[in-house]
Structures are given as C-alpha cells and as structure tokens.
Amino acid sequence: MTVLTIEEMAETLAPRQAIAGLDLGTKTIGLSMSDLGRRFATPRPVIRRVKFTIDAQALMDFATAEKVAGFVIGLPMNMDGSAGPRVQATRAFVRNMEQKTALPFVYWDERLSTVAAERTLLEMDVSRAKRAERIDSAAASFILQGALDRLSLLARSDGDEFS
C-alpha cells in the first residue's frame, strides 16, 4: 500500500477502475464508491467500527466485492489549514492498512464535507434519525466527489479519457 497524491493516483489508475471514498469516524467508517468512469460518487452503507482488525477486514471485503482500485480518505484539517485532532488517527489507520492491502490511498482535505452532507440531507427532507445513519457515507461521497472532480480536470489537461 502506498500513499499517493491525487496526481500520482491519476497516473496509476487504468481506465474503468473504480475508487472508494472513506470518512473515518470514531464509531463508523463512511463509504462511497465511484462509477467505472470515475465521474460520480455514490454513498454506500457504513462500516460500524469495532476494532482495527475487524474494521480492516470489513473494508477489504468491501474493496474486493466492489473491485476497488484505490481509496480516497478524508483528512480532517482545521479551517486554518492546520492538522485537526483526528489527522493523527487517520494517518495511523492508513499506516496500519499497509499490512492489509497493496491498494493506494490518497488523503483528501475533508473540511466542511460533513456540513455539506448534512445540508444536502436536510434539503432532501431526510428525518433526523435517518440523517444520523447516512451522514458518514454522505460525507464520504463529498470527499470522493472532490477527488473525482480533480481527476477529471487532470484528465482534461492531459487530453486523456477515463472510459
């Protein structure tokens, strides 16, 4: 497993390979998945956290089932750009995943992703109880969509197409 920049990931991905988005929380791991054209992020059910070995196995099972080519994981930065309190835990999680997978990870600034996800769920008139269930995967979708948009810009500037 390697930590890459989004530009490095763009160079390593083959056409029609999907990537997953992760929003790492203390109780859940929010999941999202790209389409094969890497244009759209779609929320997936969360992984309820138990302990690392169980969480990692659930994530790897998801990656295998969905044929994931790499992960984009939200990095919880403070609004001023400094490392937030959960940055260290996120980096430790990725380091520990090195023992479990050769798939690459990209860190993606997740500032305001949960706020945007909550606002979207409110606009969709999702009840408070359902919002609580869906917020982490919705945030993972915002994280992944940001990375997908960047990949799209990189492809256009290189004259490449994903599909």
From Swiss-Prot:
One Gene Ontology cellular component annotation? cytosol
Alphabetized SUPFAM superfamilies for the sequence: Ribonuclease H-like
Q: Which GO terms describe its biological process?
A: rRNA 5'-end processing
Picking any one GO molecular function of the record gives: nuclease activity
| Compartments where found | Cytoplasm
**Keyword Nuclease on entry:** yes
Describe its function. Could be a nuclease involved in processing of the 5'-end of pre-16S rRNA.
Q: What is this protein called?
A: Putative pre-16S rRNA nuclease
